[in-house]
Amino acid sequence: MSNVRVSNGSPSLERMDARQAEYPKPSACRNLFGPVNHEELTRDLEKHCRDMEEASQRKWNFDFQNHKPLEGKYEWQEVEKGSLPEFYYRPPRPPKGACKVPAQESQDVSGNRQAVPLIGSQANTEDTHLVDQKTDTSDNQTGLAEQCPGIRKRPATDDSSPQNKRANRTEENVSDGSPNAGSVEQTPKKPGLRRRQT
C-alpha cells in the first residue's frame, strides 16, 4: 500500500483523526428549528385544550368538566340506564392486538387446551369422556398482563418429526404375506382420470 496517493483535495489522515477525536460529526437526525422549549409547549397544549373545552361548552351547552347541563338551546334530560341501548353503558372492547384468554378454558404454555376426565356418576366405566377444565375467572385474569401466550388455532405437536404424507407400511405388515417383503415404504397411486365425453 505504499503506492497509494492521497489527493490534495481530501484531508490528510492525520487531520481526519484529530477532527474525529475533538469534534464528532453531527448525526444525520438534526433539530431543524432549535431546541424544544418544554414549558412553552406545555402552556400551548393547555391553552389549546381549554379553547376546545370552551368551544364544546358553547356548542352543546353542557359543562363536561363538572358533568352538568348549562342554559342554552339544548334541553338536557336525565334518563334511566335501562332505557338506553346497550352500547352506551357496556365496557369498551379491548384493542385488536390485546390478548384474549377465555375464562372457561385453561391452556398450557404451548397453547394446548387442557382436559380432565369426568369423575363420579357422570363418567362411564367403558369410555372416559373428556371435558374442558373450568377455572375461576379471577385466577385467570390476574396474570393476563404478564403472560399472554395467545390462542393457537391448532394444538402444538409433541413429536419433533413432521408427518410424512406417504403411506408408511410397518415391517409386520410387510411380513404378513405381501409379495414384496423388501420394501418398507410404498407411495399410493392416484386413480386414473376419467374423461367425460359429451
From Swiss-Prot:
One Pfam family named in its UniProt record: CDI
Compositionally biased region (Basic and acidic residues): 126-137
Domain notes: A peptide sequence containing only AA 28-79 retains substantial Kip1 cyclin A/CDK2 inhibitory activity.
Intervals of motif Nuclear localization signal: 153-169
Similarity comment: family membership: Belongs to the CDI family.
InterPro entries: CDI_dom, CDI_dom_sf
Protein name: Cyclin-dependent kinase inhibitor 1B
Region entry Interaction with CDK2, spans: 51-91
Phosphotyrosine modifications at: 74, 88-89
Superkingdom, natural source: Eukaryota
Subcellular location: Nucleus; Cytoplasm; Endosome
The keyword Nucleus belongs to this UniProt entry's keyword annotation: yes
A Gene Ontology term for the protein's cellular component: centrosome
PTM entry text: Phosphorylated; phosphorylation occurs on serine, threonine and tyrosine residues. Phosphorylation on Ser-10 is the major site of phosphorylation in resting cells, takes place at the G(0)-G(1) phase and leads to protein stability. Phosphorylation on other sites is greatly enhanced by mitogens, growth factors, cMYC and in certain cancer cell lines. The phosphorylated form found in the cytoplasm is inactivate. Phosphorylation on Thr-198 is required for interaction with 14-3-3 proteins. Phosphorylation on Thr-187, by CDK1 and CDK2 leads to protein ubiquitination and proteasomal degradation. Ubiquitinated; in the cytoplasm by the KPC complex (composed of RNF123/KPC1 and UBAC1/KPC2) and, in the nucleus, by SCF(SKP2). The latter requires prior phosphorylation on Thr-187. Ubiquitinated; by a TRIM21-containing SCF(SKP2)-like complex; leads to its degradation.
Extent of Polar residues compositional bias: 1-11, 104-113, 175-186
Principal location listed in the UniProt entry: nucleus
Cited function: Important regulator of cell cycle progression. Inhibits the kinase activity of CDK2 bound to cyclin A, but has little inhibitory activity on CDK2 bound to SPDYA. Involved in G1 arrest. Potent inhibitor of cyclin E- and cyclin A-CDK2 complexes. Forms a complex with cyclin type D-CDK4 complexes and is involved in the assembly, stability, and modulation of CCND1-CDK4 complex activation. Acts either as an inhibitor or an activator of cyclin type D-CDK4 complexes depending on its phosphorylation state and/or stoichometry.
Region called Disordered, residue ranges: 1-22, 87-198
Native source organism of the sequence: Felis catus (Cat)
Record-listed Phosphoserine modification sites: 10
Subunit-structure text: Forms a ternary complex composed of CCNE1, CDK2 and CDKN1B. Interacts directly with CCNE1; the interaction is inhibited by CDK2-dependent phosphorylation on Thr-187. Interacts with COPS5, subunit of the COP9 signalosome complex; the interaction leads to CDKN1B degradation. Interacts with NUP50; the interaction leads to nuclear import and degradation of phosphorylated CDKN1B. Interacts with CCND1 and SNX6.
GO MF terms held by the record: cyclin binding; cyclin-dependent protein serine/threonine kinase inhibitor activity; protein kinase binding; protein phosphatase binding; protein-containing complex binding; protein-folding chaperone binding
UniProt entry keywords in alphabetical sequence: Cell cycle, Cytoplasm, Endosome, Nucleus, Phosphoprotein, Protein kinase inhibitor, Ubl conjugation
Residues modified as Phosphothreonine: 157, 170, 187, 198
GO biological process: autophagic cell death; cellular response to antibiotic; cellular response to lithium ion; epithelial cell apoptotic process; epithelial cell proliferation involved in prostate gland development; G1/S transition of mitotic cell cycle; heart development; inner ear development
